[in-house]
A protein has these predicted regions:
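Amphipathic alpha-helical packing segments from all-alpha helical-bundle domains
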Residues: 55-56, 60, 90-100, 108-134, ...
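Hydrophobic alpha-helical connector segments
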Residues: 56-96, 143-146
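Hydrophobic/aromatic-rich alpha-helical bundle segments in the mid-to-C-terminal region
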Residues: 69, 112-117, 132-179
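Solvent-exposed, amphipathic alpha-helical segments
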Residues: 3-11, 57, 61-64, 102, ...
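Short, basic, alpha-helical segments at the C-terminal edge of helix-turn-helix-like DNA-binding modules
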Residues: 48-54
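Residue cluster at the C-terminal edge of the helix-turn-helix DNA-binding motif
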Residues: 10, 24, 35, 53, ...
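Helix-turn-helix
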Residues: 6-45
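Residues in soluble alpha-helical coiled-coils and helical-bundle/repeat scaffolds
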Residues: 34-41, 66-67, 107, 111, ...
Length: 179
């Protein structure tokens, strides 16, 4: 599954094919077709594996965060790490773009909707805990607003070909959370 998830992250849904996954994993083609009868099953497994890996990373990060008030920029960085993944230097904008391409492309794959709802619920729970531990608790409605704000900021930055969509999202989220 790691090979499939890596292909998904690197190139989106179009790169996920039984043959490509088998080649990446160094396995014969029959090994992927044995476990996944259809491409949809392979895609769903890759999305779930990647989503769970990201949630595990987020939980590990949260475990390292002491429950204490923190400055606004630290809170914003923690939230963005959960929503956009950790900063990736020169590849950050590209990885953020690929992340949003995957999110939008799931809309054309109805079989992924239940999984995406489940992963989204878990992510929102993680974000609520990040904010609460940081001294900035929010209710469900406010959390949805913050997520929508980040999503909108990132999409607008990507459309404008802004070289740093994370910085745009950081600025807007910071302004929204400022007392």
């Amino acid at each position: 599954m790691e090979a499939a998830a890596a292909l998904l992250v690197e190139g989106g849904f179009e790169t996920l094919r039984h043959r490509a996954v088998a080649e990446r994993a160094g396995l014969p083609l029959a090994s992927t077709t044995y476990y996944f009868d259809s491409l949809d099953e392979l895609i769903a497994a890759a999305v779930e594996h990647h989503g769970r890996t990201e949630l595990d990373r987020g939980r590990a990060q949260l475990a390292e965060v002491p429950a204490e008030p923190r400055d606004l920029d630290s809170v914003v960085d923690l939230v963005l790490d959960q929503l956009l993944g950790p900063p990736a230097g020169k590849r950050d904008a590209e990885l953020v773009l690929l992340r949003y391409e995957r999110l939008v492309a799931t809309g054309r794959r109805p079989y992924l909707r239940p999984l995406m709802r489940t992963l989204g619920d878990e992510l929102r729970g993680l974000l609520r805990e990040v904010l609460a531990r940081s001294g900035s608790p929010v209710d469900d409605r406010r959390l949805e607003q913050l997520i929508a704000l980040v999503d909108g900021a990132v999409v607008n930055a990507l459309i404008a070909v802004d070289p740093d969509p994370r910085a745009v999202a950081h600025r807007m989220l910071r302004e929204s959370l400022q007392p």
